[in-house]
């Protein structure tokens, strides 16, 4: 099944988007992300414009009810058959009533549509990683790995 690279979901109704349609939302989200994390990553953090270009080039991007922007990619794990959808970023961009559990359901659905064996969400951009792990666990996600940075 073909799944467009850029997609908008409003109340479950999918609408394919062009790069030109999704780009302003992605650029604004990357500016917010950059401002939050520039102190932590310093010179290693891509500029907002660079990050937007990478995402627009490399990721599937879904805008859910104008509330959440999720970028994901297909990833293979060296130790497992098949592939998973891996969340590259999950950003709240609106103030509507979309629940985080709905975002997880969307990703599970996309995993099925892509033929993936599941999906993965990370905590790399969270300011409080322990809190985000607890939040994800409350929504039924299970921790499967720990990644340490040196």
Language-model features: locations:
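A conserved beta-turn-beta hairpin within the catalytic core of GNAT-like acetyltransferases
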Residues: 76-87, 142-143
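A short helix-loop-beta-strand connector motif used in the catalytic cores of GNAT acetyltransferases and
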Residues: 50-64
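Acyl-donor binding region in acyl/amide transferases
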Residues: 82-137
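Conserved catalytic-core motifs of GNAT/GCN5-like acyltransferases
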Residues: 122, 142-150
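Short secondary-structure junctions
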Residues: 6, 137-144
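Short amphipathic alpha-helix that is part of the acyltransferase structural core
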Residues: 1-45
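Conserved beta-strand in the GNAT
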Residues: 63-75
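Well-ordered, non-membrane alpha-helical segments in soluble/globular domains
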Residues: 45-51, 101-106
């Amino acid at each position: 099944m073909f799944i467009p690279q850029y997609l908008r979901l409003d109340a479950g109704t999918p609408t394919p988007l062009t790069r030109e349609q999704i780009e302003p939302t992605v650029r604004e989200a990357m500016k917010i992300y950059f401002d939050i994390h520039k102190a932590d990553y310093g010179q290693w953090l891509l500029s907002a414009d660079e990050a937007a270009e990478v995402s627009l080039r490399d990721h599937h991007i879904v805008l859910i009810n104008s509330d959440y922007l999720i970028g994901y990619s297909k990833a293979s794990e060296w130790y497992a058959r098949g592939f998973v959808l891996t969340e590259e970023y999950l950003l709240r961009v609106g103030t509507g009533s979309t629940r985080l559990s709905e975002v997880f359901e969307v990703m599970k659905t996309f995993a099925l549509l892509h033929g993936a064996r599941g999906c993965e969400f990370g905590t790399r951009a969270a300011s409080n990683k322990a809190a985000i792990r607890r939040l994800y666990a409350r929504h039924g996600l299970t921790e499967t790995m720990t990644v340490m940075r040196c």
